[in-house]
Swiss-Prot record:
Belongs to the DnaJ family. The J domain is necessary and sufficient to stimulate DnaK ATPase activity. Zinc center 1 plays an important role in the autonomous, DnaK-independent chaperone activity of DnaJ. Zinc center 2 is essential for interaction with DnaK and for DnaJ activity. Its cofactor is Zn(2+). It comes from Cupriavidus taiwanensis (strain DSM 17343 / BCRC 17206 / CCUG 44338 / CIP 107171 / LMG 19424 / R1) (Ralstonia taiwanensis (strain LMG 19424)). GO terms for cellular component: cytoplasm. It holds the Pfam family DnaJ_C. Residues 5-70 form the J domain. This is Chaperone protein DnaJ.
Length: 377
């Protein structure tokens, strides 16, 4: 049976980053680990397949060979075909096992007298906050998965009245030696799946896992200035490790709700501000909202629609910034609506007055007319 593509096994694209590859492997390893699926041959095969894929794609040299030549590029039996050192990885590990037998130490990979320990998988929690909370900081409580020792078996995985025994196949080592011709290899024990333990009667409540999933409340402190998509790490609050391995971490990913007034651009803020025709023409003081209260700035006379004003220091002080950003106010001149006949007549008189005597009171209109005249001349 032909091997599956390593990227397909992990469920990632060929342009996946090292972090994405690692996350995909951890997710599959926790899902299909033999300790969690003691009676499933299919899960065991998928675990081995994911482990092999990760070992190849997490090694830059092996990954480069695989990307160029496929499975043949990392097959130790075809090492001479491509002239790359990465092709000899399998043989180097085999010789490492031989030297380990002679000198009491391994030449590559994991060696040791106990079962393999695995770090727990990381967890991700998505949280949505307001722009004000992002700017000023926020404290929140979240509910996340938690694993407690099983109260039925007290965490050892065995049904009360029975006991956990040392694996009779690997004698507690978690690994067994397998001879292949002149070479001696180590592989995960097929009976205990690397735990070094054997449970004749698994706990009926936790099914031999020793832990039960529950929920717990965590306090999360969101720093002032946090931006969209940033993550906060809570060490040790991920899934528990396997065989004594350390727990994973919890990552709280922050998303910011759209704001009714402001749009954020890094540490800067932008807002659209409507102003009257009279204010734009005559000038005046304009009061605008900010995240820290109201601010006033002067609007000069003859201000055109679309003009942008910059208020320094009225933006957000980012988590990595030493000073706050700016607030950009984009003014839009509003055309008056629902006018009375008297008001309309006043505007007609005003319009006639500004066009009398050749005075140029509308710079954009005049510029446009000049362009049209030159076009037809």
């Amino acid at each position: 049976m032909a091997k599956r593509d390593y990227y397909e096994v992990l469920g990632v694209g060929k342009n996946a980053s090292d972090d994405e590859i690692k996350k995909a492997y951890r997710k599959l390893a926790m899902k299909f680990h033999p300790d969690r699926n003691p009676d499933s041959k299919d899960a065991e095969e998928k675990f081995k397949e994911a482990k092999e894929a990760y070992e190849m794609l997490s090694d830059p040299e092996k990954k480069a060979a695989y990307d160029q030549y496929g499975h043949a590029g990392v097959d130790p039996n075809m090492a001479g075909g491509f002239g790359g050192a990465q092709g000899y990885g399998g043989f180097a590990e085999a010789f490492g096992d031989i030297f380990g037998d002679i000198f009491g130490q391994g030449g590559g990979g994991r060696r040791g007298g106990g079962p393999q320990a695995y770090r727990g998988a990381d967890l991700r929690y998505s949280m949505e906050i307001s722009l004000e909370q992002a700017a000023h900081g926020h404290e929140a409580q979240i509910r996340v998965p938690h694993w407690d020792d099983c109260d039925h078996c007290h965490g050892n995985g065995a049904e009360p009245g029975s006991s956990v025994e040392t694996c009779p196949t690997c004698h507690g080592a978690g690994q067994v030696r397998v001879s292949q011709g002149f070479f001696t290899m180590q592989q995960t024990c097929p009976k205990c799946h690397g735990s070094g333990k054997f449970i004749p009667k698994p706990c009926t409540k936790c099914h031999g896992q020793g832990k039960l999933k529950s929920q717990k409340t965590l306090e999360v402190k969101i720093p002032a200035g946090i931006d969209e998509g940033m993550r906060i790490r809570s060490s040790g609050n991920g899934e528990p490790g396997i065989n004594g391995g350390p727990p994973g971490d919890l990552y709280v990913e922050v998303h910011i709700k759209p704001h009714a007034v402001f749009e954020r651009d890094g540490d800067d803020l932008h807002c659209q501000m409507p102003i009257s025709f009279a204010t734009a023409a005559l000038g005046g003081d304009l009061e605008v909202p900010t995240l820290s209260g109201k601010a006033t700035f002067p609007v000069p006379e003859a201000t055109q629609s679309g003009k942008t004003f910059r208020l320094r220091g009225k933006g957000i002080k980012g988590v990595r910034s030493g000073y706050p950003g700016d607030l950009y106010v984009h003014v839009n001149v509003e055309t008056p609506v629902k006018l009375t006949e008297a008001q309309k007549e006043m505007l007609r008189q005003f319009d006639r007055s500004v066009h009398e005597g050749g005075s140029r009171h509308s710079p954009q209109e005049t510029s446009w007319l000049d362009k049209v005249k030159s076009f037809f001349s």
